[in-house]
């Protein structure tokens, strides 16, 4: 009996039946989730495909901003010592922010509240386009005037029609990096979603009050409740699945002359009348880049 082998690799020991059953159940659950598109990699892929879908911007024939226009909010950056690159107000979301209601047969869409950031991609898409909404009964097509209240809403469909909102900062609610006043996209529309456009030059601000807002020109976007202006912070970086982005807050940065700094200068970017697939700012930047290249070639020759 001393030479009899009582064990070989084919012998199952321990709770082998439970282990086999658990492995089979895990495999079945994985296949079921894959068929329903519920795997994390599938959700992230579907999110990027939906949120980066191109969107056509509005064309301003008269050069003014109108209620109902689809625009991008662009901070042109700073060419000085700060070297802040241009950025666009954009949605920050992941797969946990996507929901669908099978009971009402609606497709997947974003669920608020969501973060926003300053993305560097200038291509108009679901993520960075917003609709100008009236809050005082003005009809679509009417011009937006300086110091007139309005709201910013994401596009319909996947973007979920969320509203850009802000409120006074507190210990529990503030910007993640800078600890300044937080910006977010919310589902409920109230006074926290009201904004107004101010003329960027404080010396001429009173004279321009009530005049139509020009598109593709520098303006200030002020929050009606807190009187803080939309700002891009290049010294506070947010990392998302879309890359490195600037933190955006509602905070007014003043220089020694009590004038708002470049952090607070924004423009409503619309489409070029001749090429609606691109924004007017994109075409201007491409022309500027081509001119710089031509100048460098001439200097070298």
From Swiss-Prot:
<dbReference type="GO" id="GO:0031514">
    <property type="term" value="C:motile cilium"/>
</dbReference>
<dbReference type="GO" id="GO:0005879">
    <property type="term" value="C:axonemal microtubule"/>
</dbReference>
<keyword id="KW-0966">Cell projection</keyword>
<keyword id="KW-0206">Cytoskeleton</keyword>
<protein>
    <recommendedName>
        <fullName>Cilia- and flagella-associated protein 161</fullName>
    </recommendedName>
</protein>
<keyword id="KW-0963">Cytoplasm</keyword>
<dbReference type="Pfam" id="PF24569">
    <property type="entry name" value="CFAP161"/>
</dbReference>
<dbReference type="InterPro" id="IPR055325">
    <property type="entry name" value="CF161"/>
</dbReference>
<comment type="function">
    <text>Microtubule inner protein (MIP) part of the dynein-decorated doublet microtubules (DMTs) in cilia axoneme, which is required for motile cilia beating.</text>
</comment>
<dbReference type="GO" id="GO:0060271">
    <property type="term" value="P:cilium assembly"/>
</dbReference>
């Amino acid at each position: 009996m001393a030479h009899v082998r009582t064990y070989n690799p084919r012998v199952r020991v321990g709770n082998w039946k439970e282990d086999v059953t658990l492995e089979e159940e895990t495999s079945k659950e994985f296949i079921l989730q894959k068929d329903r598109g519920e795997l994390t990699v599938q959700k992230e892929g579907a999110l990027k495909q939906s949120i980066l879908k191109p969107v056509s911007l509005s064309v301003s024939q008269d050069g003014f901003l109108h209620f109902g226009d689809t625009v991008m909010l662009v901070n042109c950056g700073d060419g000085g010592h700060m070297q802040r690159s241009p950025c666009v107000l954009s949605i920050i979301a992941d797969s946990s922010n996507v929901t669908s209601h099978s009971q009402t047969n609606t497709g997947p869409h974003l669920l608020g509240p969501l973060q926003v950031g300053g993305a560097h991609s200038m291509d108009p898409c679901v993520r960075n386009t917003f609709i100008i909404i009236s809050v005082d009964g003005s009809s679509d097509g009417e011009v937006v005037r300086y110091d007139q209240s309005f709201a910013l809403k994401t596009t319909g469909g996947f973007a979920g029609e969320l509203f850009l909102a802000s409120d006074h900062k507190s210990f529990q609610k503030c910007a993640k990096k800078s600890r300044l006043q937080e910006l977010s996209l919310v589902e409920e529309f109230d006074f926290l979603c009201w904004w107004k456009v101010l003329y960027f030059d404080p010396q001429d601000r009173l004279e321009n009050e009530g005049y139509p807002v020009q598109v593709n020109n520098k303006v200030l976007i002020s929050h009606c409740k807190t009187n803080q202006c939309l700002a891009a912070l290049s010294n506070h970086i947010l990392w998302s699945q879309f890359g490195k982005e600037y933190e955006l807050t509602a905070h007014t940065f003043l220089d020694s002359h009590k004038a708002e700094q470049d952090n607070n200068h924004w423009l409503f970017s619309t489409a070029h009348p001749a090429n609606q697939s691109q924004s007017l700012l994109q075409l201007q930047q491409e022309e500027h880049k081509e001119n710089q290249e031509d100048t460098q070639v001439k200097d070298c020759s």
